[in-house]
Amino acid sequence: MNDLIINHIAELILPRSTDKPLKGKELDELNVVKNGTVVIKDGKIVYAGTHTDDYDATETIDASGKVVSPALVDAHTHLTFGGSREHEMSLKRQGKSYLEILEMGGGILSTVNATRETSEDDLFKKAEHDLLTMIKHGVLAVESKSGYGLDRENELKQLKVSNRLAEKYDLDMKHTFLGPHAVPKEASSNEAFLEEMIALLPEVKQYADFADIFCETGVFTIEQSQHYMQKAKEAGFKVKIHADEIDPLGGLELAIDEQAISADHLVASSDKGKEKLRNSDTVAVLLPATTFYLGKEDYADARGMLDNNGAIALATDYNPGSSVTNNLQLVMAIAALKLKLSPNEVWNAVTVNAAKAIDINAGTINTGDKANLVIWDAPNHEYIPYHFGINHAEKVIKDGKVIVDNTVSFKA
């Protein structure tokens, strides 16, 4: 006897199972089954396809008028941080620049100070709350970066917190050491600080899957970023890079040359970099909520990347300064509106390709897969990026069990 059948599904979203990320035109290929059925036993998918009465189960969910998809994958978050920076919104409205806010004690270094001052247990409680919000919105696989400690003690603290979260909730969670995220005030130079972070690589390896660096004007150069990435690979890490967010320094090209698993942001990437994606499996992780939140007009050139047969994914970039959202559904809407992605491209970019960007087996619904699913209160898959700003996730299913039920009942 099977454990659960979900039947009469209006639309069942079945992204293609693939060893490599979907590239170029492949991103627009999505198998959407009308009147679908999913059968689950022992936390795994037994059957997913057109409606059938050939299976029995101890529990049945009628998904008439609903959409069912793989659980979403958020491939770029800064989940563990102390404090918040809501007061900076009014300063920005007054015309204060980022550097002026930084000089006033705000900006990233204020988050560094808050993170350093927050105990590991308190940091865990805060990150747990934010993670549960993500789960309620349909995410069951997450990448979590450090980068607000900027010293040995606090970088380790952030990574330990994300590892504790993964263990407590048994999530598909990957952890990224982003020690070179900024340069702390106490550092004698960018170069000296980078060497401190490189020296930490062997110690943080037990807590982190990836090593990341912020390659940008005023932070770390192309040459410094390459040095760090090579040292990280020698220490056994797969590498990522925050690249070309503000200036076209060539971070995308570097990511491809160093065979990074992903390059993230890429708002200012050059045509040369986009062309190099053609022969690479490096995933371009685009973060349109960041551009939106910062009030900028120029978004990453998703269409140009796809036209060059590149692989792209979408993520929230959840952080306290430039993308204060842990709702990946909102990112889906912004991507459709501002990156000009089709609904099919959006869905693939937050499932199978996002999974490739963090090297996990997720984002598909195939026989033998973990039964990590979302039942959406929506008539079709195009509706979710169309109707933005609310939570469409009705039920979140992890390993075949309903762990979130957002159904709301009102009493007159």
Swiss-Prot record:
UniProt subcellular location: Cytoplasm
Annotated residues for binding of 4-imidazolone-5-propanoate: R85, Y148, H181, E245, S322
Residues given in the record as Zn(2+) binding sites: H76, H78, H242, D317
Residues annotated for N-formimidoyl-L-glutamate binding in this entry: Y148, N319, G321
Membrane-spanning segments: none
Residues where Fe(3+) binds: H76, H78, H242, D317
Keywords: Cytoplasm, Histidine metabolism, Hydrolase, Iron, Metal-binding, Zinc
GO molecular function term, any single one: zinc ion binding
Cofactor: Zn(2+); Fe(3+)
Note on cofactor: Binds 1 zinc or iron ion per subunit.
Pfam families hit by this protein: Amidohydro_1
Main location: cytoplasm
The family this protein is said to belong to: Belongs to the metallo-dependent hydrolases superfamily. HutI family.
Functional summary from the UniProt entry: Catalyzes the hydrolytic cleavage of the carbon-nitrogen bond in imidazolone-5-propanoate to yield N-formimidoyl-L-glutamate. It is the third step in the universal histidine degradation pathway.
Protein name: Imidazolonepropionase
Gene: hutI
